[in-house]
Amino acid sequence: MLALLVLITLPAKADEACRALAGVALAHARVESAIEQPGVDFPVKGDRLAAHAGAHCAVRVVSHPTTDSDIHFELWLPPAGAWNGKYLQKGSGGWGGEVYTYALVTPLNRGYATAVTDDGHVADGTARFTVGHPQKIRDFGYRAIHETSVLSRRLIAAYYQRAASQAYFVGCSDGGREALMQAQRFPADFDGIVAGAPAARWSHLMTAFVANARLLDNAPLPSSKLAAIQKASLASCDALDGVRDGIVDDPRRCRFDPAAIQCKAGDNDDCLTAQQVATVRALYAGPVDPVTGARIHPGLEPGMEDDGGSWRLWILGGEQRKFGFSNFADLVYQGQGWDSTGSDIHRDLAAAQEREAPYLDAFNPDLRAFRAHGGKLLLFHGWGDAAVPPRGTIEYVQDVGNFMSRHGEPANLDGFVRLFMVPGMGHCWGGPGATSFGNEEVPPAALTQDADHDIVMALDRWVTQGKAPEQLIATRPVEPANSSARTRLLCKYPQVARNGRCVAAGNPP
């Protein structure tokens, strides 16, 4: 009888504690609802896996730090007996604009109190939300993430009657940019951060998107040519690591020149015209400022040109064009008639640096305060990423080391920053390689969930136990689900995997 009373009383107390959060006083914010949920099921949707979130208190909050701000977020709180004592916040993607609760399933089921924000607006796939709303640019750039962090921890303390022992942030793409922004602007918000494929040089990246679109308008590259380009780049560079597996292990060592498949006569899908050779070379090299000659952003890497989530989607499928054009037409020029066909790349870059870089760019190398806080930062980037070219992330880590050295800090960043480059992976996940290592919102069933195979678990172990990850094991699930999965070693940059071990890399350019 006593046991039965306990079983009845515990859910009732949890529901009462959850509903009580509606009365918590929050600066310039309010709890819209706080409801005890027995669980939430997410069906398969596109390439999204089906998932089930366990019981939790779902708290919806709206914050108005300025009169122009309308920041929404949702916080999921596991039952007190299931809480691991920690807080994990997820980042957004693209232009944000949605409280994407699917991202909360895995951290909740692992015992985290977890939250995600809409970045302060409702999305329509463009930057139109910024027109006439300068504060919403700041909300999107950095403020919504910080507000969500501060308010969530206030609610966590009220619900559990104790503060979270650790706080983590995990994001990829724009979420990766948000992750670096937190380390740079709000170094005490999080004890550990995972930044995947960070769109850190936002103003430069958007300018590069427009430059690439202009390049392809003037010198088109048919998608039917991508298979020949990839076949040739793999023939040139796949075996440089000693293994022919359809993956370029380190594209920086690749010397592929598309002129190798220039048409000798006529034109067909197995070769490139002279103009197409020049176009592909320019895409690999990255766009330059036509006035100064300075490179605007690193270019694309060889080896995944024909992958559905790489060049086929981002370069020829219009994704770069869509993001870049809206960035300038709506955010930078505020709907004042920017003409994509007659745009001046030099002028556009200068305008972007003036009007959006102060709020969106996140490549400040000064991480002294984050290091002093005891923060740990793990970065990852796919070598086949055609959305955010990967060399920019390597350059950022190098810039941090150089900055620290110039300011009397240890140049060796191993104590708080580590980067993992992922061969055969596109943007954030996916591609022909082994690309599952805790980076997806919901991991596939074949993924071993421990700190050797999961980057978020590796971060937690580093923060709580002081054991930094030297390597990760990435998995490529195969069907049927009970078949053996393919794995690949991911090494701490600048090391590379050779014969099942991480070894020092050579000297790529």
Where are these regions (language model features)?
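A catalytic-pocket lid/entrance helix-loop region that shapes and gates access to the active site
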Residues: 181-183, 188-288, 421, 437-453
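Cap/lid segment of the alpha/beta-hydrolase catalytic domain
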Residues: 84, 93-161, 207-208, 215-216, ...
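Conserved alpha/beta-hydrolase "acid-adjacent" motif
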Residues: 387-391
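Bacterial N-terminal signal peptides
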Residues: 1-9
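Alpha/beta-hydrolase fold nucleophile elbow
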Residues: 162-173
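Short beta-strand/loop motif that positions the catalytic acidic residue
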Residues: 379-381
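Catalytic-loop region of hydrolases
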Residues: 13-86, 102, 243-248, 257-338, ...
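Glycine-rich nucleophile elbow surrounding the catalytic serine of serine-hydrolase chemistry
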Residues: 171-181
